Amino acid sequence: MGNLIKELQDEQLRKEALTDFRVGDTIRVATKIVDGGKERTQVFQGTVMARRGGGAGETVALHRVAYGEGMEKSFLLHSPKIVGIEVVKRGKVSRARLYYLKGKTGKAAKVKEYIGPRAPK
């Protein structure tokens, strides 16, 4: 039974490889939005706060501050609605979850930029 579930989940995975990003990186996620009969692409840019799960159910939580208000948005990485993911800047953090950024604004919400080669996973 468990093998059948795993096979079904593997069919749902993206065929093309996802961009390599980690917690602390600033990424831009382009999603497909359907408004009435029209289809358009909407882009959300934010800092990766958490990356959860694995397989078809893997999610990423992004955080950004716009007009003084903090926003959070979660995305299913293997969703067919995601058009693309682009890494804007690499971040240097010492935590796996950056939930402490929620209450911060301005410079306190900044993540140090990582400069140098990224070691493979």
Swiss-Prot record:
GO molecular function: structural constituent of ribosome
An annotated GO BP: translation
Keywords annotated in UniProt: Ribonucleoprotein, Ribosomal protein
InterPro entries on file: Ribosomal_bL19, Ribosomal_bL19_CS, Ribosomal_bL19_sf, Translation_prot_SH3-like_sf
Domain of life: Bacteria
GO cellular component: cytosolic large ribosomal subunit
Signal sequence extent: none
Entries under PROSITE patterns matching the protein: RIBOSOMAL_L19
Known function: This protein is located at the 30S-50S ribosomal subunit interface and may play a role in the structure and function of the aminoacyl-tRNA binding site.
Family the entry assigns: Belongs to the bacterial ribosomal protein bL19 family.
Name of protein: Large ribosomal subunit protein bL19
Organism expressing this protein natively: Chlamydia caviae (strain ATCC VR-813 / DSM 19441 / 03DC25 / GPIC)
Lineage of producing organism: Bacteria, Pseudomonadati, Chlamydiota, Chlamydiia, Chlamydiales
